[in-house]
């Protein structure tokens, strides 16, 4: 029997995190978000759910709250001595390393496409391969992410079905207050501290009593 787990820290939650641990065989594969129904748990999903890449539901009712401490977290994760995936050695990486030259070539392709008006916007990312065969070190990486990003939602996921993922995001995709749902777009990163006048709000559009007069048209458009 092998355990999978999720560890997450809410924004501004101080020194506390939540651990959800579940037997690997009891994780639920979802091939559509409609399968969630009234399920209660942690959902890890790809951008596009397919037969080969389903969403995975951690629905264990046991959720332990513990302090952000390496020994405490490791003790909770290894609780009952189940064969946790963190006990295993990482497999050697045989893929292609994404070097600086490859990144520059991709960047130039993106830049040319934007200049030629073939696309309006592009996001270029890269991967970084760390040479470390001890999976337990990802817990230290999780703690470091919590320390460096106090206002972000930090998650560490580990299971055979998903692999090992460390996530950090300041973005609230969707929150509910009663029957009201609220979503946030991060496209506008301008200073939002000033309140605009009624005349200005009529001219450029009012968004939650914040000053958007200094925003670019791009940011105003993306925040609609």
Q: Over which residues does each language-model region extend?
A:
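A short, Trp-centered hydrophobic/proline-enriched beta-strand micro-motif
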Residues: 3-11, 120-122, 152-157
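SIR2/sirtuin-family catalytic core signature
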Residues: 134-177, 181
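Cytosolic ligand/metal-binding cores
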Residues: 37-39, 175-224
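Short, structured patches in soluble enzyme cores that scaffold and shape functional sites
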Residues: 47, 126-128, 157-161, 168-170, ...
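Short, flexible beta-strand-to-coil junctions
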Residues: 8-15, 45-51, 157-161
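Non-catalytic accessory segments adjacent to catalytic cores
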Residues: 24-130, 178, 215, 219-221
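Short Lys/Arg-enriched alpha/beta "domain-start" segment
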Residues: 1-35, 130-133
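Short helix/loop capping segments that flank catalytic or ligand/cofactor-binding pockets
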Residues: 51-55, 66-68, 132-133, 167, ...
């Amino acid at each position: 029997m092998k355990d999978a787990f999720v560890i997450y820290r809410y924004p501004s939650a101080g020194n506390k995190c939540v651990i959800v641990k579940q037997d690997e065989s009891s994780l639920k594969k979802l091939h559509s978000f409609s399968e969630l129904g009234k399920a209660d748990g942690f959902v890890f999903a790809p951008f596009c759910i397919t037969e080969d890449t389903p969403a995975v539901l951690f629905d264990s009712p046991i959720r332990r709250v513990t302090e952000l401490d390496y020994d405490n977290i490791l003790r909770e994760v290894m609780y009952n001595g189940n064969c946790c995936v963190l006990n295993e050695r990482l497999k050697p990486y045989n893929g292609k390393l994404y070097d600086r030259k490859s990144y520059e070539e991709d960047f130039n392709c993106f830049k040319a496409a934007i200049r030629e008006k073939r696309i309006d916007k592009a996001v270029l990312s890269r991967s970084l391969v760390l040479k470390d065969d001890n999976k337990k070190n990802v817990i230290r990486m999780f703690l470091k992410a919590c320390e460096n990003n106090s206002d972000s939602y930090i998650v560490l996921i580990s299971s055979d079905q998903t692999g090992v993922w460390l996530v950090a995001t300041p973005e609230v995709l969707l929150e509910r207050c009663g029957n009201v749902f609220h979503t946030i777009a991060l496209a506008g990163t301008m200073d939002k501290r000033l309140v605009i006048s009624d005349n200005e709000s009529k001219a450029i559009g009012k968004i939650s009593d914040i000053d958007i007069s200094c925003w670019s048209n791009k940011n105003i458009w993306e925040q609609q």
